Amino acid sequence: MTSTLKKISRHVALTLAVSACFSPVTQAAELLTEGVFKVGMEVTYPPFESYDSNNNIVGLDPEFAALIAQHLQAKPQLIDTKFTSLILGIGKKYDAVISGMYVTPERQKQADAIPYALSGASIIALKGGAVQPKTEDELCGVKVGLQAGTTWVTSLKKHSDEWCLKNGKPAITIQEFPTAPEASQALLSKNIGAQLEIAPAAQIIVDKSRGRLGISSTRLVYPLPLGIYIAKGNTELAEAIKATLATLKANGQYAALIKKYNLESID
């Protein structure tokens, strides 16, 4: 660990007490490329990350990546990668993954996670359709579409086995899609009965559906923290990211981002 980062780790609390202003710190030693903070994300996932009309990557996660890079005195580089391959590229293709990804025990076996927000899923259904599940209990007997690689696949299978079947109800049929938009298209085509999607993204899907889709759930389903994933053992980068989040919370930028993207803060 560089002496500069050791000093940062020791004195970050004092720095925040003295000033709530955002002040950059020296770059962590274990970035893949000196002066560049490389971040993996799947850029099909608004409001977390998506391409705008000028082909720029915009959203919550690019904004967080830029702020962390600024704190490291590095340039952010965003690398578009399939969601199911994101964890595998940490420490090889990029320094971190920031992509609306939940913190789960399975992922933590492969990488270290720093929680940065809290969210859960919403259930999307055809507006006015016969299937309007309010909770996960009402997904029994429903064909549910969702993006491949999400933690909800395991959660739904477990709920189907341990609640639906044990209560004499039909199983949940799970269909995975490469991307969330493909799951939405399947719902519009009536090939599935409902879609499970992270709440902020679900709202955007509904808003863009021209009144054809609606959120049927009445509360968040499977709420979990979202995490910034880095290579196991990269303590320098972990401490630098934690210091960035502490600074952003102290100067109000964190609260503004969380509010802007309809998430919940996490301590």
Please describe what each predicted stretch is.
Residues 29-100, 176, 240, 251, ...:
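Extracytoplasmic small-molecule ligand-binding "clamshell" domains
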Residues 30, 128-135, 233-239:
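Short helix-loop capping/hinge motifs at secondary-structure junctions, enriched
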Residues 37-41, 136-154:
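Short loop->beta-strand "edge-of-pocket" segments that line small-molecule binding or catalytic clefts
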Residues 40-45, 79-84, 93-104, 119, ...:
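Beta->alpha turn/N-cap motifs
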Residues 43, 118-125, 207-246, 261-267:
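Periplasmic-binding protein-like
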Residues 65-72, 152-176, 206-210:
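Ligand-binding cleft/hinge of the Venus flytrap
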Residues 66, 70, 75-138, 219-220:
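Acidic, polar ligand-binding/catalytic clefts
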Residues 84-88, 101-109, 155-159, 186-222:
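A ligand-binding cleft/hinge motif common to bilobed small-molecule-binding domains
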